[in-house]
Amino acid sequence: MTQSLADMRRDYTRDGLAEAQAPGEPFVLFHQWFADAVKTEQAPVEANAMTLATVDGEGRPHCRVLLLKGLDEQGFTFFTNYESAKGQQLQANPFAAMTFFWPALERQVRIEGRVEKVSAQESDAYYQVRPLGSRLGAWASPQSRVIAGREELEGLVKATEARFSDTQPHCPEHWGGYRLLPERIEFWQGRASRLHDRLNYRFVNGQWQRERLAP
């Protein structure tokens, strides 16, 4: 390593975030920022990639990168195996946090709230538009469980392909969506000298309240 970690930094000077720019509803601002990210971010960055943090029954945190697959006025939707580690964690503690980071825009969004399963109909609707390989994978992979090796996984895939050789796979009961119902959404815009802009929205008594946080 030619540069020490202590010396690795960059200054953020692209933009600012003033209250005058921020709507009263955080979903409006998220849609604006997400549209900017879709137009601006380039591979390997995926605009809908986010870090999802969960907490297990023993209070230990876990995080991983997932893809956002749905957004409406209710909340933010992602899909997974309900029997996976994250599914078990959400069953034990149905609260989570998401973080989106768009480096080209020098922006970050943090979202916190309760998580609930979406309807079976909504899960099936998304499942049916996935590529065939992904639909088969939802049946084949015992997500988060220990397996002997890659060969075992490939064997499970072949068995699943044979099972559905004459029919289209349907959405398994152990697979589906979760929706995070936000209680807090923070918008972060990088600024020079680490004096970043942070606008925080809190859902209180059925209404969104906006406040500025110190960087």
UniProtKB/Swiss-Prot annotation:
Gene3D superfamilies, alphabetized: Electron Transport, Fmn-binding Protein, Chain A
Free-text remark on how the cofactor is bound: Binds 1 FMN per subunit.
Binding site for substrate: 9-12, 69, 126, 130, 134, 194-196
EC number: 1.4.3.5
Keyword Flavoprotein recorded: yes
Residues binding FMN: 64-69, 79-80, 86, 108, 143-144, 188, 198
Catalytic activity: pyridoxamine 5'-phosphate + O2 + H2O = pyridoxal 5'-phosphate + H2O2 + NH4(+); pyridoxine 5'-phosphate + O2 = pyridoxal 5'-phosphate + H2O2
Annotated InterPro entries: Pyridox_Oxase, Pyridox_Oxase_CS, Pyridox_Oxase_N, Pyridoxamine_oxidase_dimer_C, Split_barrel_FMN-bd
EC class name: oxidoreductase
Pathway annotation: Cofactor metabolism; pyridoxal 5'-phosphate salvage; pyridoxal 5'-phosphate from pyridoxamine 5'-phosphate: step 1/1; Cofactor metabolism; pyridoxal 5'-phosphate salvage; pyridoxal 5'-phosphate from pyridoxine 5'-phosphate: step 1/1
Function per UniProt: Catalyzes the oxidation of either pyridoxine 5'-phosphate (PNP) or pyridoxamine 5'-phosphate (PMP) into pyridoxal 5'-phosphate (PLP).
HAMAP family recorded: PdxH (MF_01629)
Assembly behavior: Homodimer.
Family: Belongs to the pyridoxamine 5'-phosphate oxidase family.
Protein name: Pyridoxine/pyridoxamine 5'-phosphate oxidase
Species annotation: Pseudomonas putida (strain GB-1)
